[in-house]
């Protein structure tokens, strides 16, 4: 029986889950929006929300705790400088999960995880080029 067992295994070992969530958290903080499967999205939300709360604390110990979880000092710097100040007055609820249909290959449920008041310019040059190409195709 699995009474009281919280969290999903996602067909991965504990070390693989830990590494995957660290990478997903870093990507989410960097780009402020990611597309993933719905179960992974539901698992990553509390992890990143706790990281944002660490960023709002802002002290050295909180920064070291965030670095130990994400393992990327540049991402942690963005978390503590940009994201934590943006959500200084908000008490939780920093992320939103929106269902995004099903994946073509295996029909897995997809979801978009994004920050509530996200910076739309954080997606990067590759995404801007893709959006511009889509707008050109739609206009033509």
Swiss-Prot record:
A molecular-function term among this protein's GO annotations: structural constituent of ribosome
Pfam families assigned to the protein according to its UniProt record, in alphabetical order: Ribosomal_L17 (PF01196)
Gene Ontology process terms (BP): translation
Region forming the signal peptide: none
Domain of life: Bacteria
Keywords attached to this entry: Ribonucleoprotein, Ribosomal protein
GO annotation, cellular component aspect: cytosolic large ribosomal subunit
Keyword Ribosomal protein set for record: yes
SUBUNIT field: Part of the 50S ribosomal subunit. Contacts protein L32.
Family: Belongs to the bacterial ribosomal protein bL17 family.
Protein name per the record: Large ribosomal subunit protein bL17
Organism: Rhizobium rhizogenes (strain K84 / ATCC BAA-868)
């Amino acid at each position: 029986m699995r009474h009281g067992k919280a969290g999903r295994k996602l067909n991965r070992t504990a070390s693989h889950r830990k590494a995957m969530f660290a990478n997903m958290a870093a990507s989410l903080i960097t780009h402020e929006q990611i597309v993933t499967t719905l179960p992974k999205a539901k698992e990553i939300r509390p992890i990143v929300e706790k990281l944002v709360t660490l960023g709002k604390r802002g002290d050295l110990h909180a920064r070291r705790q965030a670095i130990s979880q994400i393992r990327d000092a540049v991402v942690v710097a963005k978390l503590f400088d940009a994201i934590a100040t943006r959500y200084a007055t908000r008490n939780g609820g920093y992320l939103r999960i929106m269902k995004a249909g099903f994946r073509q290959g295996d029909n897995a449920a997809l979801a978009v995880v994004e920050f509530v008041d996200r910076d739309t310019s954080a997606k990067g040059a590759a995404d801007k080029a893709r959006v511009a190409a889509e707008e050109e195709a739609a206009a033509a």
